[in-house]
Amino acid sequence: MTTSGGLTGPGAFGRLPQPFHQPGITSFVEFLALQAPDLLPGRLQMPAGGQPPEVPHGTTIVAVAYQGGVVMAGDRRATMGNVIAQRDIEKVFQTDEHSCVGIAGSAGIALEVVRLFQVELEHYEKLQGTTLSLEGKANRLAMMIRANLPMALQGLAVVPLFAGYDLFADDPQRAGRIFSFDVTGGRYEEHSFHAVGSGSTFARGALKKLFRDDFDEPHAVRTCIEALYDAADDDSATGGPDLTRRIYPVVAVVDANGFRRLADDTVGGVVEQVIAARMANPGGPVAVLP
């Protein structure tokens, strides 16, 4: 008896096809490229001379390292040209127990890349019995972004921000690490803080003035929200806190205990503090000169 999957013999029904039994491939993306390349992100091609379609774009993501971990936050707005496509999109996601990723760029493709990246890390852990190092995870994500280059050249780019807690760091106080990428798959480690997306210029300016080496988690969370507020103040594609709809930034913390997304009530309390302070000083906090 021969099944549609190419298996023969009694009991063949319900068994995995032969390609799933090949040893040596720890990368799910590599396996998919060999067996079903049409399922990978970036497989679509536009006609020559065609214009990229109007698609929702994620905007601003920020990350701040503090003593013992890292905080990542993202606004909730997606834009499509000059239109607000969505007011409550989520752009910060857990990728495994000790890392997270934030997305900017073409939202649909970025979300597909994130889901595939989550499967990639889980696949490796199940086959190897251990997790990739933080740098190994960043390298895998860079490889996936590089595979999307044909779409990026056609106007559908994905630019994520990756952060996590390095379980193998020599100094646990410096274990929070941040990695940025370009559309070609270039991977760069950032120090202390970073921002990506349309409002990143304004967010990085705020982070540069507010960051301190002795930050703890509450200070890092407050600084991320201040930076997103400044980005929304100057960039129309970045959404500020929406108190009437109770839509607040997504804020995630990664430390030695793992990934943790802050509850909306917690983030809302910090947002209210930021807005109350801005009522007295619309420009926000200023750096203290020596």
UniProtKB/Swiss-Prot annotation:
<dbReference type="GO" id="GO:0019941">
    <property type="term" value="P:modification-dependent protein catabolic process"/>
</dbReference>
<keyword id="KW-0645">Protease</keyword>
<dbReference type="GO" id="GO:0019774">
    <property type="term" value="C:proteasome core complex, beta-subunit complex"/>
</dbReference>
<comment type="pathway">
    <text>Protein degradation; proteasomal Pup-dependent pathway.</text>
</comment>
<dbReference type="InterPro" id="IPR022483">
    <property type="entry name" value="PSB_actinobac"/>
</dbReference>
<dbReference type="GO" id="GO:0004298">
    <property type="term" value="F:threonine-type endopeptidase activity"/>
</dbReference>
<feature type="active site" description="Nucleophile">
    <location>
        <position position="59"/>
    </location>
</feature>
<dbReference type="Pfam" id="PF00227">
    <property type="entry name" value="Proteasome"/>
</dbReference>
<keyword id="KW-0068">Autocatalytic cleavage</keyword>
<dbReference type="InterPro" id="IPR029055">
    <property type="entry name" value="Ntn_hydrolases_N"/>
</dbReference>
<comment type="subunit">
    <text>The 20S proteasome core is composed of 14 alpha and 14 beta subunits that assemble into four stacked heptameric rings, resulting in a barrel-shaped structure. The two inner rings, each composed of seven catalytic beta subunits, are sandwiched by two outer rings, each composed of seven alpha subunits. The catalytic chamber with the active sites is on the inside of the barrel. Has a gated structure, the ends of the cylinder being occluded by the N-termini of the alpha-subunits. Is capped by the proteasome-associated ATPase, ARC.</text>
</comment>
<dbReference type="InterPro" id="IPR023333">
    <property type="entry name" value="Proteasome_suB-type"/>
</dbReference>
<feature type="propeptide" description="Removed in mature form; by autocatalysis">
    <location>
        <begin position="1"/>
        <end position="58"/>
    </location>
</feature>
<keyword id="KW-0888">Threonine protease</keyword>
<protein>
    <recommendedName>
        <fullName>Proteasome subunit beta</fullName>
        <ecNumber>3.4.25.1</ecNumber>
    </recommendedName>
</protein>
<keyword id="KW-0963">Cytoplasm</keyword>
<comment type="function">
    <text>Component of the proteasome core, a large protease complex with broad specificity involved in protein degradation.</text>
</comment>
<comment type="similarity">
    <text>Belongs to the peptidase T1B family.</text>
</comment>
<keyword id="KW-0865">Zymogen</keyword>
<dbReference type="InterPro" id="IPR000243">
    <property type="entry name" value="Pept_T1A_subB"/>
</dbReference>
<keyword id="KW-0647">Proteasome</keyword>
<keyword id="KW-0378">Hydrolase</keyword>
<dbReference type="InterPro" id="IPR001353">
    <property type="entry name" value="Proteasome_sua/b"/>
</dbReference>
<dbReference type="GO" id="GO:0005737">
    <property type="term" value="C:cytoplasm"/>
</dbReference>
<dbReference type="GO" id="GO:0010498">
    <property type="term" value="P:proteasomal protein catabolic process"/>
</dbReference>
